[in-house]
């Protein structure tokens, strides 16, 4: 099959020329757009998640020969969580080429964290099926970039620290809510609030939901530490 101009442009952003273009077409097709003659990316997302996990586990082991399983687990989780996958998807503007059904399109599907995270995993699976594990690994390490090297510092991030603070006091996990989203699709600004079960709350604004959640958690932690 021939790719559309949009998908050809996306191939360049991705840095992989597909030998089997149909794999890429399926990887960007959401279940809301699938038909009897055109599959969706759900099964590919399942495979891509496993390929991503293997690549990241291998990379972390190579970076730190002395790390324990307890140290590696939070680093691994930080690299493969949906927020990180969605951030990577945004960096290559994957949302612009997603094939969505009308209802999903109208509800802002191109910006949804879950859809973007699933789609980048499906794209990883497409590269794996098209060119093998080495090609998929090279793609992942290039797209994730410095995140792999910086994750050690971020393993115990403010969200994790706040959750541990709450658990140590027998409280429910903190709750995060989107207060507002402003700005254009390519440069959104999110305001996120966080609340713990004793009623304390704070909020923060940033260019991604994850960054805003982390900043809100940091602000609330600072407030809790000040109040004793």
From Swiss-Prot:
Asked whether the UniProt record includes Hydrolase among its keywords, one would answer: yes
What InterPro entries is this protein classified in?
Answer: dsRBD_dom, RNase_III, RNase_III_dom, RNase_III_sf
Q: Which cofactor does it need?
A: Mg(2+)
Q: Where in the cell is it found?
A: Cytoplasm
Q: Which cellular component appears as one GO term in the record?
A: cytoplasm
Q: Name one GO biological process term.
A: mRNA processing
Q: Which GO terms describe its molecular function?
A: double-stranded RNA binding; metal ion binding; ribonuclease III activity; rRNA binding
Q: Which UniProt keywords apply?
A: Cytoplasm, Endonuclease, Hydrolase, Magnesium, Metal-binding, mRNA processing, Nuclease, RNA-binding, rRNA processing, rRNA-binding, tRNA processing
Report the EC number(s), separated by commas if there are several: 3.1.26.3
So what does this thing catalyse? Endonucleolytic cleavage to 5'-phosphomonoester
Residues of the DRBM domain = 157-226
- Domain RNase III span(s) in chain numbering: 7-132
Binding sites annotated in the UniProt record for Mg(2+): 45, 118, 121
The main location is cytoplasm
Q: Give the annotated active site.
A: 49, 121
SMART domains assigned: DSRM, RIBOc
Which Pfam families does the record cross-reference, listed alphabetically?
dsrm (PF00035), Ribonucleas_3_3 (PF14622)
What biological function has been recorded for the protein in this entry? Digests double-stranded RNA. Involved in the processing of primary rRNA transcript to yield the immediate precursors to the large and small rRNAs (23S and 16S). Processes some mRNAs, and tRNAs when they are encoded in the rRNA operon. Processes pre-crRNA and tracrRNA of type II CRISPR loci if present in the organism.
Its assembly, as annotated, is: Homodimer.
What's this protein's family per the entry?
A: Belongs to the ribonuclease III family.
Q: What is this protein called?
A: Ribonuclease 3
User: Could you tell me which species this protein originates from?
Assistant: Roseobacter denitrificans (strain ATCC 33942 / OCh 114) (Erythrobacter sp. (strain OCh 114))
State the encoding gene. Answer: rnc
